[in-house]
Amino acid sequence: MATNRPSCGGAEFARERNIPLGELSLKQFASEEERDAAMRDFFQSHGVELVVDAGYDRIHTRPLLDAFQGRIVNVHPSLLPEFGGGMDAVEQALRSGVAKTGATVHLVTEDLDAGPILAQESVPVLKDDSVETLRRRIHEAEYRILPAAIRLLEARLAGRGVPANSSRRLRIRGV
């Protein structure tokens, strides 16, 4: 596991279970590219085949994107392409007055939140929703679709069933 936030819950989980942990705060490096090269090297040295961005709030650069092309998955708190490209997707959904938003799992590309979609689940926007209540329901959807999307991608990468270039995606609950 690699993190840019050593105090996050995932890092604690890894430490408790002796899972290799790369603590790669940007402060340690001269550039984002240097950080991503270190992340690439860390992952490759541990035989990582699939990178899952869960709670990772940085944009990847060429060293990591090139090494793991088609094998980096991100979770985004909206039904992409709506409200992509930033950290305030939940706030945007509430401001816009949409009836539903949701969660998306997609492949990471050099274009922010624009990679092929693997799975989506819609979440209704309730009239009395706050950012916190809507974000909590979106997180619950993310927890459901991320494992399913990872299994789909694993099957593609292993050559079982769904070709790697397939546009097939999982539609979960109302998308």
Where are these regions (language model features)?
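Donor/substrate-binding cores of folate-linked one-carbon enzymes
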Residues: L50-I172
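Short, surface-exposed acidic-centric catalytic microdomains
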Residues: M1-A38
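Generic signal for short, ordered secondary-structure residues
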Residues: L21-G22, F43, I72, V125
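Anion (oxyanion) recognition and catalysis
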Residues: R15, Q44, L94
